[in-house]
């Protein structure tokens, strides 16, 4: 039996969930923006009607409103999106246990052996679409192929543009349908890689596919090899339900509301990020021994900042121990330029069961205190108990507690 893999993608996911929750908005263009009160906020999602007017995700709200002035603008509700995403996963699991989340609104399915129960691939796709629509009010588009990359490209380049929302891209159809497309339509090719390819005279997927592998590997190494295979629809990776289960690191970052220029202000946010990282580590019963921090400025055209890591004395999930390492890195490598984004990561993980008592300090007490604080926050909210520094003007703890994934709950 030929392998059949689906890429199931939700149409304008955030906007679709908002519309399903607010039937009174039916028929009106809808935009989801991080901060509707600020015209400088960015578009997180736009309904198909707004997209047809030229609105794109990531553009400024005021620009979108010029293109679609009658659009209703709503604030995102990330907790609701997460809930619906989980609900959709449960729907997909009725058809196969081989489900691999790709993002909050995209999932791979291997339905190879589901055909005996649910019919041909297109029939299964239609049943999946109907179930998702009836239970969530969200429309799904489904790309089909014998590999994950074929399914992904079938979805992005064809299914999203078809009334049925379903498209099967076989290897036999690649040369006729996929290869004439611009090189940027190839999965894995971003803006920078598009420039590189175009400078080399490679403007279509077919031109890449027909370029010798030796030339591609010689110029772009392993990444070029992978893209050449993708252009041929070759991807041996299976749909793996638990591929994201084992964590290699626990990180947390945030974009600041304005440039931070004072070291004492940056230290406040750095401590709060370490608090969040350690809370997540304790929740997973993990400890880490390598701490890394990354900082950057607001101007992406002329990047500033650094990314450095160091090994700690012990595996830990104690906030102050991780913070001491992060603070050391910051003081050592910060050049004094304004900072707009910070990130803290804890890696080299091991089980919390390996905790070693220290008879010459207060490590065990601090270790238990962390879990006690977590229990209080779980019961009464993240702002129920805070460090004193979180009451300073530089603190972002209270604002961050209102958000999931950087957006309001």
From Swiss-Prot:
Please give the name of this protein. DNA polymerase IV 2
HAMAP family recorded: DNApol_IV
Quaternary structure per UniProt? Monomer.
GO function terms (MF aspect):
damaged DNA binding; DNA-directed DNA polymerase activity; magnesium ion binding
Q: Which Gene3D superfamilies match?
A: 3.30.70.270, 3.40.1170.60, 5' to 3' exonuclease, C-terminal subdomain, DNA polymerase, Y-family, little finger domain
EC code(s) of this entry = 2.7.7.7
Q: Does the record's keyword annotation contain Transmembrane helix?
A: no
Cofactor detail note? Binds 2 magnesium ions per subunit.
Q: Which Pfam families match?
A: IMS, IMS_C
Q: Which organism is it from?
A: Halalkalibacterium halodurans (strain ATCC BAA-125 / DSM 18197 / FERM 7344 / JCM 9153 / C-125)
**Which GO BP terms apply?**
DNA-templated DNA replication; error-prone translesion synthesis; SOS response
Chain ranges of the UmuC domain? 5-190
Q: Which UniProt keywords apply?
A: Cytoplasm, DNA damage, DNA repair, DNA replication, DNA-binding, DNA-directed DNA polymerase, Magnesium, Metal-binding, Mutator protein, Nucleotidyltransferase, Transferase
- Which InterPro entries does the entry link to? DNA/RNA_pol_sf (IPR043502), DNA_pol_Y-fam_lit_finger_sf (IPR036775), DNA_pol_Y-fam_little_finger (IPR017961), DNA_polymerase-Y (IPR050116), DNApol_IV (IPR022880), Rev_trsase/Diguanyl_cyclase (IPR043128), UmuC (IPR001126)
Where in or outside the cell?
Cytoplasm
Q: Does the keyword Nucleotidyltransferase apply?
A: yes
Q: Where is this site: Substrate discrimination?
A: 14
